[in-house]
Amino acid sequence: MDYISNTPSEKEAMLKKIGVENVEDLFKPIPDDVTFKRPFNIPPGLSELELKRMIKSKAARNISMEEQICFAGGGAYDHYIPAHIDHLISRSEFYTAYTPYQAELSQGVLQAMYEYQSMICELTGMEVANSSLLDGGSATGEAVLMASRISRKKKILMSRGINPVYREVARTYGRPRGLEFIDLGLNETVTDMEELEQKLDEDTGAVVLQYPNFFGSIEDLNVVKNLISARKRTLLIIVVNPLTLGVLKPPAEFGADIVVGEGQVLGNPINYGGPYLGIMATRKRYVRQMPGRIVGATTDSDGKRGYVLTLQTREQHIRRARATSNICTNEALNALTAAIYMATMGKKGIKEVGEQSFKKAHYMADRIDDMEGFEVVNKDNFFHEFVIKTPLPSAEIGERLKRKGILGGLDVSRWYSFDGFLVCTTEKRTREEIDGYLEALEVISSD
């Protein structure tokens, strides 16, 4: 409905009805020392032209990937997005963040979500996927809660090789539910498997690893699979970058019970703060513990194929005590974007993106490792991200590269006790851009 403000007479009638003299009486329970009393500093209204100028001026302070050459990763990646994707998702019948509430009236949207789920299952090797969560971090948190419900255990072993933001989100989700999080240390840039073996016991509800991990290193999931298979009701959660799965073995082959990840790489642009896309897939026997919505295919009484919301285990649809999640906003538009991207690229295209990213990263790492004062920490075991030790503090390296128009990487000392620079390449980076980065490093280190 249209918003129409209340008139003074309407306000007076409402106040009289509830038995108070003025609006201020409604706020008397608020302590006086925390009550905001000074006037709001709100400027006068602007015309449309003035407002556009103001917004453009503020937006000009942002730096886009068109203005800087991006060699940063750590959870958000600068991949090429085919031009037609934005056109298709902007169609009026698609352009909303929500899976439809009157599902049967929106067969096209539901079919798109069904295709998205099917392609996520094909990438991960899992049996069922939901129609999206908020982002990679929230998907990790939901996976931990889901694993605890299934295993009926509270102890969670979580590798320090997982994106540190994801780890913090998972703790935020799990601690109010009484979950106990125990970190698994690192052997350089991979999970310490001996420590995993020592800490893994019958009380462990889940083991969580990332593949490739935050440093770009590829964990030995065969070892993890063998360790967990000897335990009853201990689930394996694997956090993935879906674009690497065109080259790497799918998590299902390592016995994964729940697979989650960030779907930004599947056609969604880099945005500070999102919106991004949470991916989740699991085994069929766990489907009723999966949060979010699941679209299924069926036939009507005439034998015609149709799409329905098969499961909606959220608190808005069923009793709160039985709900698996209270997730409210749904990233349906981002999932649609991912579906169009995967359909556009196909198996061959997704594999090529992964291979190009891999080869360019290894070319770059080999060159950096040969430079005086630089060392690639995980040069023998990474996908398209790697950690380098630099002759200057990583924060300084990053700032000086930024002045040259290069987003050079991430300073991992923000989250870890060692100084390292996390560098990433994707299929977008050209030989000239990589060589320019290397030249910039040489100049910076020699100053």
UniProtKB/Swiss-Prot annotation:
It catalyses: N(6)-[(R)-lipoyl]-L-lysyl-[glycine-cleavage complex H protein] + glycine + H(+) = N(6)-[(R)-S(8)-aminomethyldihydrolipoyl]-L-lysyl-[glycine-cleavage complex H protein] + CO2. Keywords: Oxidoreductase. One of its GO terms (biological process) is nucleoside metabolic process. The lineage of its organism: Bacteria, Bacillati, Bacillota, Clostridia, Halanaerobiales. Belongs to the GcvP family. N-terminal subunit subfamily. The glycine cleavage system catalyzes the degradation of glycine. The P protein binds the alpha-amino group of glycine through its pyridoxal phosphate cofactor; CO(2) is released and the remaining methylamine moiety is then transferred to the lipoamide cofactor of the H protein. Its EC number is 1.4.4.2. It comes from Halothermothrix orenii (strain H 168 / OCM 544 / DSM 9562). This is Probable glycine dehydrogenase (decarboxylating) subunit 1. Pfam families: GDC-P. It is an enzyme of class 1 (oxidoreductase). SUPFAM superfamilies: PLP-dependent transferases. InterPro entries: GcvPA, GDC-P_N, GDC_P, PyrdxlP-dep_Trfase, PyrdxlP-dep_Trfase_major, PyrdxlP-dep_Trfase_small. GO terms for molecular function: glycine dehydrogenase (decarboxylating) activity. The keyword Repeat does not apply. It comes from the Bacteria. PANTHER family: GLYCINE CLEAVAGE SYSTEM P-PROTEIN, GLYCINE DEHYDROGENASE (DECARBOXYLATING). The glycine cleavage system is composed of four proteins: P, T, L and H. In this organism, the P 'protein' is a heterodimer of two subunits.
